[in-house]
């Protein structure tokens, strides 16, 4: 939709190209309950709408024609196709032949392919785009909407950016969209929060469907932004960040010699009982419970830190895009596994004065079943390493997450995270800095 003129001025000054789009959107007339049914659609080829939509094109062009930032005109959004929108294109071409015209809706009716100067689609899969680009097309390709950044999402951006580097005719895409639409209000607890649909007592609402930006409504960056920043940088800048991360990871993975006096290691005292294994060192002690499926106690300087035995974690809160593709139902077995994981026994792998290593084995009630292990390594210097191991099995549903639930006795205020910055996931981690 046309924006306020100040935004166009800023784009002119900062070298930001834009597609200027008329305020035309009518997908409610031809898209019924998600299905395409264009037997009656607006504006279509209805003569009573033709002058109206051409007037919208004229108003936008006359207002914005002198903005250097405007690279392309767009006839509108999600309004199917027909003679009326074709008339808009003809007006743009006649009045301003220096600029191209964009429109996505012709993908639903190729009889009106002449409306647009480029192939434009929404949310096309990378292999669909590749298929188009390999077919020796006459028109360049643009994704007028992609990534669908609802809530905490925007995974898999790499697949699209790499297309732009491989195919000259792939012109990139527009993330849907930039900023959440939300309003400050006071919630039932008296807190000032950003509210969306349903937070204001209304019953007919789209709920959080307005929360689709890469920044929040107050302009603060959402977790996805660090990956957007990474993939929208030049290939050279991305390579530089990858090199920095590789060096940092290599340094973190090796033992660094301390410049001053090394910490003295006191021999570990190991006590083996029928139901427990005790490990005691300088200022710390641990108790591993055979029956309790993990550590029963972790004390440092006499203070207990462990609330309950750690457990493997297989579930996380579902996101908007998860729910949109039915993922919570497909992966529901992992929610059950997260709660009902079975304990299969403890094995002492090593028990000496310098190191104690204990393995706890778990069965995962998926179909087919799987297994996991938590391995605790206690070193004489007082370090505790926890390794979580999941043994994958063919045929199991997609795994939402894998980690360790580690509940402490009270809040922990002094922690150091060694890993990637921000919120990362297998398909959204390249922007993280080590």
Can you describe what each PLM-predicted range is?
Residues 244-434:
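Beta-strand/loop-rich accessory regions of lumenal/periplasmic or secreted enzymes
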């Amino acid at each position: 939709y046309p924006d306020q003129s100040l935004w166009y001025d800023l784009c002119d000054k900062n070298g930001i190209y834009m597609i200027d789009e008329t305020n035309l959107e009518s997908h409610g007339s031809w898209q019924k309950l998600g299905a395409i049914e264009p037997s009656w659609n607006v504006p279509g080829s209805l003569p009573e709408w033709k002058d109206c939509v051409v007037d919208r094109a004229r108003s936008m062009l006359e207002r914005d024609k002198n903005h250097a930032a405007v690279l392309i005109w767009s006839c509108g959004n999600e309004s199917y196709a027909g003679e009326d929108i074709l008339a808009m294109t003809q007006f743009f071409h006649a009045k301003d032949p220096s600029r191209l015209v964009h429109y996505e809706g012709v993908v639903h009716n190729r009889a009106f392919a002449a409306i647009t100067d480029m192939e434009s689609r929404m949310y096309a899969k990378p292999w669909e785009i590749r298929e188009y680009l390999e077919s020796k097309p006459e028109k360049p390709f643009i994704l007028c909407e992609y990534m669908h950044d609802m809530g905490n999402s925007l995974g898999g951006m790499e697949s699209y950016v790499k297309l732009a580097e491989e195919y000259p005719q792939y012109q990139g895409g527009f993330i849907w969209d930039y900023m959440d639409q939300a309003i400050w209000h006071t919630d039932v607890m008296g807190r000032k929060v950003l509210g969306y649909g349903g937070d204001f007592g209304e019953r007919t609402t789209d709920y959080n469907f307005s929360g689709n930006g890469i920044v929040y409504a107050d302009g603060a960056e959402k977790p996805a932004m660090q990956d957007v920043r990474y993939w929208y940088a030049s290939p050279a800048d991305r390579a530089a960040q990858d090199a920095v991360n590789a060096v940092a990871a290599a340094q973190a993975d090796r033992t660094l010699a301390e410049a001053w006096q090394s910490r003295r290691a006191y021999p570990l005292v190991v006590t083996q009982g029928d139901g427990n294994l005790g490990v005691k060192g300088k200022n710390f002690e641990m108790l591993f419970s055979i029956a309790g499926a993990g550590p029963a106690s972790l004390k440092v300087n006499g203070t207990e830190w462990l609330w309950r035995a750690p457990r493997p974690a297989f579930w996380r809160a579902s996101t908007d895009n998860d729910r949109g593709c039915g993922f919570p139902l497909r992966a529901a077995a992992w929610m059950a596994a997260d709660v009902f994981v079975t304990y299969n026994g403890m094995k002492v792998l090593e028990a000496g004065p310098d190191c104690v290593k204990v393995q706890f084995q778990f069965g995962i009630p998926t179909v087919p079943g799987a297994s996991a292990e938590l391995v605790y390594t206690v070193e004489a210097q007082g370090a505790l390493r926890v390794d979580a191991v999941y043994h994958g099995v063919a045929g199991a549903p997609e795994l939402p997450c894998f980690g360790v639930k580690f509940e402490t006795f009270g809040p922990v205020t002094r922690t150091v995270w060694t890993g990637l910055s921000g919120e990362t996931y297998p398909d959204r981690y390249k922007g993280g800095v080590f």
